[in-house]
C-alpha cells in the first residue's frame, strides 16, 4: 500500500508527509515505524522492511524519504515498485520535486497521492 507525497513545494510536501506519519503513529502507536533516506536505502533493507511484521501489530509503517535524490535509491524504488505496492505494510514515499515521468509511474501504483505545489507568484504586467 503506497501513499505518495510530492509537489514543487518541498517544505509543504515534507510537512504533509510527517503530519501523516504523526497521525498514523497516534492512531496505532504499537505499529513499528521505519524510515529510510536516500543514502540509507539498500535493496536488502527495503526487502526486509516490506516483509516485516510486528509482534503485536501486523502492519509496519515505512517512510522512504526522498529516494530520487540519489540515483541508485531512486532506481531501487522503481525496480521494486510492484513489491512495495503489494506489501501489507503501509509505505509512504516522500518525493518532493519529482519528475513528471516518475510521477506517472508512482501515481499508477499509489493508493493515495498528496500533492503540495508552490503557489504561483502573480506577476503584475502592464
Whereabouts are the PLM-identified features?
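Conserved beta/loop motifs at nucleotide-recognition and modification sites
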Residues: 1-126
